[in-house]
């Protein structure tokens, strides 16, 4: 088969301990999945989960021991950080039951759901989709994927983010409103999951703005952390 132009390269993510990389299919994100974050955004309760997406090429790979540069995006003066656990899907399926979800997980990574909060809020006020606030170039910094078998305690792991050495976000994966397994069950009822899908599982409280020159360092117990410098 020939193409009218050369197709873009497949986006892929490093895997801890392997030379092979993880090819990215889709990026799903869960909104308001920690109680305290839901409250700081003006919501409360265990509402049904809702999802949005980022393009695969929004990935910005942060390699271990290095700080990756992220260009400050256009059209915003209020760029926010959201540190998240990312689930990497290794086996696809639809209508996956929570009890079977672990069979579909390849591994986990640390990710940032970078958000143009001013644009997101403007779209919310107008009752319009807020893709412009979430789905932009470099909006999904992510570290290497650790195979699931190597992090059996991920469901109770600590999660944190520092900006310029100061704590901004600190919580525990156990505080997810919808657990990893429940999220997979709900998500796979709406879309058929495929190998290569990523799920950003939501952010804890403490989201806030970053500026050019800031350095963000995020981590989750058992996973390789990420470091991002805003340019």
Predicted regions and their residues:
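Extended, compositionally biased flexible segments
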Residues: 1-100
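Catalytic-pocket segment enriched in acidic/His residues
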Residues: 2-22, 37, 43-45, 64, ...
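Interfacial segments of alpha-helical transmembrane regions
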Residues: 101-106
């Amino acid at each position: 088969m020939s193409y009218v132009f050369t197709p873009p390269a497949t986006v892929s993510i490093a895997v801890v301990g392997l030379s092979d990389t993880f090819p990215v299919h889709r990026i799903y994100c869960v909104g308001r999945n920690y109680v305290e974050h839901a409250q700081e955004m003006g919501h409360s309760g265990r509402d049904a989960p809702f999802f949005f997406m980022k393009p695969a090429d929004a990935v910005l790979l942060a390699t271990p021991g290095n700080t990756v540069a992220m260009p400050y995006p256009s059209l915003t003066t209020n760029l926010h950080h959201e540190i998240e656990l990312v689930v990497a899907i290794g086996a696809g399926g639809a209508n996956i039951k929570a009890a079977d979800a672990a069979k579909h997980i390849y591994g986990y990574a640390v990710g940032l759901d970078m958000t143009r909060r001013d644009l997101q809020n403007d779209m919310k006020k107008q009752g319009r989709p807020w893709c412009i606030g979430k789905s932009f170039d470099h909006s999904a910094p992510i570290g290497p994927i650790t195979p699931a078998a190597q992090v059996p305690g991920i469901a109770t792991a600590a999660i944190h983010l520092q900006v310029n050495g100061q704590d901004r976000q600190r919580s525990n994966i156990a505080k997810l409103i919808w657990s990893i397994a429940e999220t997979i069950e709900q998500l796979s009822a709406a879309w058929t999951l495929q190998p290569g899908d990523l799920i950003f599982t939501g952010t804890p409280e403490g989201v806030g703005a970053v500026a050019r020159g800031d350095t963000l360092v995020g981590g989750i117990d058992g996973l390789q952390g990420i470091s991002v410098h805003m340019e």
